[in-house]
């Protein structure tokens, strides 16, 4: 900044220049904490651009503007030192000399409680995410490990490991809704599940005619009061195949 006096009048012309100031203008230039950083400039420019925003955004950013005003001239302008600051000393948010520096405002009375609460919220958020195992434990469905894993049973290997939705052996079998299967129930359930893996119903379509035994068989599963399910075969067509055809043989 330079001054030029017009000797024909009392007017003084002020011309703003971007020449770097002398080094002795900043006595504490070696202390990096007194200089504004790029984050400080970005924050100030964001606050100054609130004038072009909608009224709803202005309301949300009013608190940020108040905070920005409280830190006015609390740091030295690094861009002014480099000769690249586009603002004058009165309009720049940062100090252009040591005389303009102001002490930063004291922290609010409850700043320690605020920091502690923020830290507690971050910890609770991290715990809520948790590792994969905890999430799987929380999100278990009622059908969790109520059936034997087909891949594990046929190949002896399952890529899901302990996170598999199905049981890897009778020892991991659970009842519907949770809880391990105990005693005879485990044996009966395991046998039934093995039958299901191989195919519970085996149906062969055949032509039923008088004098020819039907090969059609089906499986029926019954459950006893103690919880053990058993399987028995029923040859239904053999019993009813001649019900409607016997009278023809009698006539002949």
From Swiss-Prot:
PROSITE patterns in the record: ZF_C3H1 (PS50103)
Start and end residues of each stretch annotated as Disordered: 1-31
Pfam families: zf-CCCH
Xref: InterPro entries: ZFP36-like, Znf_CCCH, Znf_CCCH_sf
SUPFAM superfamilies, per the entry: CCCH zinc finger
GO molecular function, one term: DNA binding
Keywords recorded for this protein, A-Z: DNA-binding, Metal-binding, Repeat, Zinc, Zinc-finger
GO biological process: regulation of DNA-templated transcription
Zinc finger map (C3H1-type): 71-99, 143-171
Compositional bias ranges of the Basic and acidic residues kind: 1-21
Name of the protein in its database record: Zinc finger CCCH domain-containing protein 28
């Amino acid at each position: 900044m330079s001054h030029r006096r017009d000797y024909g009048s009392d007017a003084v012309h002020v011309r703003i220049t971007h020449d770097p100031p002398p080094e002795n203008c900043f006595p504490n230039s070696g202390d990096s904490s007194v200089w504004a950083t790029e984050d400080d400039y970005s924050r100030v420019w964001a606050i100054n651009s609130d004038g072009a925003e909608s009224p709803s955004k202005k309301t949300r950013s009013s608190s940020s503007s108040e905070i920005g005003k409280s830190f006015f001239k609390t740091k030295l302008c690094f861009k002014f030192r480099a000769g690249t600051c586009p603002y004058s000393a009165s309009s720049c948010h940062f100090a252009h000399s040591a005389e303009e520096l102001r002490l930063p405002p004291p922290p609010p009375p409850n700043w320690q409680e605020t920091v502690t609460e923020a830290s507690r919220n971050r910890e609770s958020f991290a715990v809520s995410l948790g590792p994969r195992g905890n999430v799987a434990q929380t999100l278990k469905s009622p059908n969790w490990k109520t059936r034997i894993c087909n891949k594990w049973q046929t190949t002896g290997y399952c890529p899901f490991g302990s996170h598999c939705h199905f049981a890897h052996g009778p020892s991991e079998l659970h009842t519907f809704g949770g809880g391990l299967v105990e005693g005879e129930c485990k044996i009966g359930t395991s046998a039934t599940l093995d039958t299901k893996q191989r195919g519970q119903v085996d149906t062969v379509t055949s032509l039923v005619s008088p004098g020819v035994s039907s090969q059609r068989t089906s499986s029926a599963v019954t459950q006893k009061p103690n919880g053990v399910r058993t399987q028995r075969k029923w040859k239904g067509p053999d019993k009813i195949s001649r019900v409607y055809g016997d009278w023809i043989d009698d006539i002949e």
